[in-house]
Amino acid sequence: MKEVDNLDSIKEEWVCETGPPDNQPLNDNPQKDCEYFVDSLFEEAEKAGAKCLSPTEQKKQVDVNIKLWKNGFTVNDDFRSYSDGASQQFLNSIKKGELPSELQGVFDKDEVDVKVEDKKNEVCMSTKPVFQPFSGQGHRLGSATPRIVSKAKSIEVDNKSTLSAVSLNNLEPITRIQIWLANGERTVQRFNISHRVSHIKDFIEKYQGTQRSPPFALATALPFLRFLDETLTLEEADLQNAVIIQRLQKTAEPFRKL
């Protein structure tokens, strides 16, 4: 089986080109090079210790959706270039059957279900903030905390409507915020960029209603974990089209100096 030792051979941002090992020349067909790269990633993930799971063995977990396109890849609809250094480290971890470091600790003791879709024959035109449930074959990667990498087939989009609980000003810029709740549920809501982080927190409390969770804080998920100042606007906090995580506080008692 041919191996891809690293992702440094990806030269261009908008074309997936990863050549064969041993300094062999690139295929004249960029599409074939892209297919080779994506297929190798799945092969290396399985080689790292994956085992096949039947549908009855798979448990419901927190989902992280990764799609490998011809011109880049998306992580929960966040588009990334193959040529970016951080992207190469991210994909190298996936190839080794490991959870990328930027996702570690984000979901706090939850088992993360990383789903990888092969879309190497398609170009990602834009990100769509909709949840896409998984259907296909799963592979559990060997590690202390179970991880999932799965090659999905064609899937149906979950058309669950979001709660319209936020008053919008159509004369101001509007952005979509993806919100991962502590129970693993995901929702998408529109906000003006002049809204504050506290408005997102208010929306979550209304969304959860009678099933309101214990005290929580909000944090970003990508590219790294960062707790958010609730007094900042979405524009000031650079949260346009961002992914937000609900983090439960371990105690209802406020932080205090010892």
UniProtKB/Swiss-Prot annotation:
Keywords: Cell projection, Cytoplasm, Endoplasmic reticulum, Golgi apparatus, Nucleus, Ubl conjugation. Ubiquitinated. It holds the Pfam family UBX. Residues 170-247 form the UBX domain. The keyword Ubl conjugation applies. One of its GO terms (molecular function) is acetylcholine receptor binding. It is found in: Golgi apparatus; Endoplasmic reticulum; Perikaryon; Cell projection, Dendrite. Residues 1-152 are annotated as: Required for interaction with CHRNA3. InterPro entries: NSFL1C_SEP_dom_sf, SEP_domain, Ubiquitin-like_domsf, UBX_dom. Residues 168-258 are annotated as: Required for interaction with VCP. GO terms for biological process: autophagosome assembly; cellular response to leukemia inhibitory factor; Golgi organization; membrane fusion; negative regulation of ERAD pathway; negative regulation of proteolysis; nuclear membrane reassembly; positive regulation of protein catabolic process. SUPFAM superfamilies: NSFL1 (p97 ATPase) cofactor p47, SEP domain, Ubiquitin-like. The keyword Endoplasmic reticulum applies. Residues 61-125 form the SEP domain. GO terms for cellular component: cis-Golgi network; cytoplasm; cytosol; dendrite; endoplasmic reticulum; Golgi apparatus; nucleus; perikaryon. It comes from the Eukaryota. Residues 1-165 are annotated as: Required for inhibition of CHRNA3 ubiquitination and translocation of CHRNA3 to the plasma membrane resulting in an increase in acetylcholine-gated nicotinic acetylcholine receptor currents. Its main location: Golgi. Part of a complex composed of STUB1/CHIP, VCP/p97, CHRNA3, and UBXN2A that modulates the ubiquitination and endoplasmic reticulum-associated degradation (ERAD) of CHRNA3. Within the complex UBXN2A acts as a scaffold protein required for the interaction of CHRNA3 with VCP/p97, this interaction also inhibits CHRNA3 ubiquitination by STUB1/CHIP and subsequently ERAD. Interacts (via SEP domain) with CHRNA3 and interacts (via UBX domain) with VCP/P97; these interactions are required for the interaction of CHRNA3 with the STUB1-VCP-UBXN2A complex. Acts to repress the ubiquitination and subsequent endoplasmic reticulum-associated degradation of CHRNA3 by the STUB1-VCP-UBXN2A complex in cortical neurons. Also acts to promote the translocation of CHRNA3 to the plasma membrane and subsequently increases plasma membrane acetylcholine-gated ion-channel activation. Plays a role in the inhibition of STUB1-mediated TP53 degradation, via its interaction with HSPA9 which acts to inhibit TP53 binding to HSPA9. Positively mediates the ubiquitination and proteosomal degradation of RICTOR, may thereby act as a negative regulator of the mTORC2 pathway. This is UBX domain-containing protein 2A. It comes from Rattus norvegicus (Rat).
